[in-house]
C-alpha cells in the first residue's frame, strides 16, 4: 500500500503540469444591437388580424424609414460606405431576393435603370446561387430580406461575396445573419411584422429602393436639381397618400364581397404596374388560396388570353401616363372575351371608368413612386377576400414567416 502513494503523487504532478500548459480561452466579445421596437407593436391592439394592423401601420413605417435619411432637402445614407467614386465605378447591379422581396427587386430594376442608367438584373435568390452568375468586383449586389435569415438569399449573398462583388442588404431585423454578412446594410424601420404575408416590410423595402436610386442618380449627375427636389418632396408625401387610400378601404371590401368565390383571378399591368401585379397576385393566393397569376399586359395575346372566359376577374393596373392607352387596349381585349375588369389607376385617368366594370382610384404622385400607392388596394383586396372565405389570414397553410431552409 505505501508504494502506491508516490505513483499517485506523480500523477497529480503531471495533471498539474497539463493544466498549466492549457491555453487560455479567449474572451468572446458579443456585438450589441439596439432594436428600437415597442412591445405593443407585437400585439394586435384591437384588430382581428395582425395583417390588417400592419396594413394600417404602413404610413408610419414608411415615414420612419424616410425621416432619418432625408435632411435639409437631401438624401443622406449614413448607413452605407459607398463613396461617389464607388458609385461611378459600378458596372452592373444585381438585385437578389425571394417572394415579395423579389417583387420589390423588379420595381428596383425599373426605377434604378430609369434614374441612374446603370444596368440592373433581378434574380430569385435560389436561382442566382446555382446559375454560375457573371458577377465581380465592379458589380453591386443588393439583397433584400425582411427577416435577414432567408436561407437562399443568405447563400446568394455568400456566392456574390466569394466572386468579389460588393453586397448591400436591405433588411428589417437588426443584427440578423444577412445584415452582419453584408458590406453595407440599410435597415427598413417597419417594426415587427407578425403576419406571414408581408405588407409594411414590402412597402418600406420599396421606400429604401427609391432612396438608393435617387441618391445614386444625384451622385452620378443623372438628375437635375429641380427633379431631385421634386422626387424628395413626393417621397415625403407618400405616408399621407397611403393613409388617404386606407380611408377608402370599405370600397375595396365591397369589391371583395363580389369576387371572393372566384376560382381564378388574373392581374395585368405594364412596366411598374406589372411589377406590382406580381405582388398583388401573390398576396391574394397566399392568404385566400384562390388561383391567381400576374402577367405583363402585352403578353396576354401570346397565350394567356386563352384562359379568359365569361366571368373571369381581371385586375388591370394602369397608372403610368405613357402606357395607359396600351393597357386600356388590353382591357378591351379581355372584356371582349367575357372578363369582368377591376381597374386600378390614378385619379387623373378618368377614361378607365369607361372601360372597366369597377375602378379603384389612387392619388397621383411621381411616376417612379406609384408602386407604393398601387399596392395598397391590392393588399386590402387580398385581405378582405381571405376574410370572407374564412381563411387563417395571419398563418396561411404551408407557409412560414422566415424561410430558413433551402
Could you describe each region identified by the protein language model?
Residues 1-25:
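Intrinsically disordered, compositionally biased charged tails
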Residues 21-64:
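Intein/HINT protein-splicing elements and their conserved insertion hotspots or analogous self-processing inserts
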Residues 32, 40, 340, 353-355, ...:
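Generic C-terminus detector
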Residues 58-62, 66-94, 184-313, 387-406:
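Active-site phosphate/pyrophosphate-binding segments
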Residues 64, 104-106, 121-122, 151-154, ...:
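Extended hydrophobic-aromatic, low-complexity segments
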Residues 99-103, 199-206, 271, 275, ...:
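Short, conserved micro-motifs enriched in small and acidic residues
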